[in-house]
From Swiss-Prot:
Span of the signal peptide: none
Gene name in the database record: FEN1
Subunit structure, as described in the record: Interacts with PCNA. Three molecules of FEN1 bind to one PCNA trimer with each molecule binding to one PCNA monomer. PCNA stimulates the nuclease activity without altering cleavage specificity.
Co-factor binding comment: Binds 2 magnesium ions per subunit. They probably participate in the reaction catalyzed by the enzyme. May bind an additional third magnesium ion after substrate binding.
Protein name: Flap endonuclease 1
Listed cofactors: Mg(2+)
Organism annotation: Ajellomyces capsulatus (strain H143)
Amino acids binding Mg(2+) 1: D34, D86, E158, E160
């Protein structure tokens, strides 16, 4: 799930933190990819009849098709991926997982009903909601990656947290995931849409945490508190507290402790804190997650030459993939993994830290930009209201 409405808040309050670009802009970089999130996205890439891709024997192959060809596209563009798989979820996440299971069970029933009486759109919608990543999906993807010569890591718990460790240590340029909570785990850079298909034509979004904090004028603790208030995998949001209210509460009070105190002491009782809302434990999971240090032997990864015959045996003989396509893809993989060894020029230079004066100038420019955005928003809203109030047919 990630963090509800966080990207919207960043867009509105720290637009300079987000850079949209093409996949080729990341040539020569190493990237840690949240495997489970990627596999989930491959599984929901269904056919028009609402069914997943399958082999002749009826086995699901969407996850393997996605992992093989999307990884190939990443390597074709000179990027060296390392995939990170989820371990056991933290205990605090069990409530969220139970809710997801219930939603999927309800969706499965609705899917069956839609197949009987619903439209094609309804069948596809409910089919997507029933999808979940199984242990078998993970194991088959690991087998495939090994045959491709692409490294992977098993995280003790959350994959995003382990990706963040690798990014902070400089072992990879960025963490890649659709989950915005990767920023809560202190990943300096988050890439979104990296494993999307080329047909979707979505730009790769590069989000810089330091610019997010600068734009929001918060330290990391306040940022994590904001994310908890917005609603995360560990806790639901406080009822009736939307994104703008959450941002205002953190800005006004500075911490969740103060926010909770203010809500409880409010005579109007505008908001109600849920009875079981362990925000301190949630915060601790973001600040001290169960991860392996970057110098741990399990985090020592390298890229190998693909096992072409192994790929043919697994994908062609066992999963009924096209042999010509698999052999051609393996040849591209072998060639491009070597090409990706080339270093980017930026790797030879260390960034120069900004002076306090430069920081102040940037902050002022950012505040001016925000004011202009607010002013434009007000003017647009006013123009819409005026247009609505005019009788039809008048100019």
């Amino acid at each position: 799930m990630g963090i509800k409405h966080l990207y919207q808040i960043i867009q509105e309050n720290a637009p300079d933190a987000v850079k949209a670009g093409e996949i080729k802009n990341h040539f020569g970089r190493k990237v840690a990819i949240d495997a489970s999130m990627s596999i989930y996205s491959f599984l929901i890439a269904v056919r028009s009849d609402g069914q997943q891709l399958t082999s002749e024997t009826g086995e699901t192959t969407s996850h393997l098709m996605g992992m093989f060809y999307r990884t190939l596209r990443i390597v074709d563009n000179g990027i060296k991926p390392v995939y990170v798989f989820d371990g056991a979820p933290p205990k605090l996440k069990s409530g969220e997982l139970a809710k997801r299971f219930m939603r999927k069970s309800e969706a499965a029933e609705a899917h069956e009903e839609a197949k009987e009486v619903g439209t094609a759109e309804e069948v596809e919608k409910f089919s997507r909601r029933t999808v979940r990543v199984t242990r078998e999906h993970n194991e088959e993807c690991k087998k495939l990656l090994k045959l491709m010569g692409v490294p992977y890591i098993d995280a003790p718990t959350e994959a995003e947290a382990q990706c963040a460790v690798l990014a902070r240590a400089g072992k990879v340029y960025a963490a890649a995931s659709e989950d915005m909570d990767t920023l809560c785990f202190d990943s300096p850079i988050l890439l979104r849409h990296l494993t999307f298909s080329e047909q979707r034509k979505e730009p790769i979004l590069e989000i810089h945490l330091d610019r997010v904090l600068e734009g929001l004028d918060m330290d990391r603790k306040q940022f994590v508190d904001l994310c908890i208030l917005l609603g995360c995998d560990y806790l639901d949001p406080i009822p009736k507290v939307g994104p703008n209210t959450a941002l205002k509460l953190i800005r006004d009070h500075g911490s969740l402790e103060q926010v909770v105190e203010a809500i409880k002491s409010d005579p109007k009782k505008k908001y109600t804190i849920p009875e079981d809302w362990p925000y301190k434990e949630a915060r601790e999971l973001f600040f001290d997650p169960d991860v392996r240090n970057a110098d741990h032997p399990d985090c020592d990864f390298k890229w190998e030459a693909p096992d072409v015959e192994g790929l043919v045996k697994f994908l062609v003989e066992e999963k009924a993939f096209s042999e010509d396509r698999v052999r051609n893809a393996a040849a591209r993989l072998q060639k491009n993994l070597k090409t990706a060894q080339q270093s980017r020029l930026e790797g030879f230079f260390k960034p120069i830290a900004k002076t306090e004066q430069e920081k102040a100038v940037l902050k002022r420019k950012h505040e001016e930009k925000l004011e202009l955005q607010k002013k434009k928003k007000k003017e647009d809203s006013k123009a819409k209201k005026e247009a609505k109030s005019k009788p039809r047919g008048t100019t």
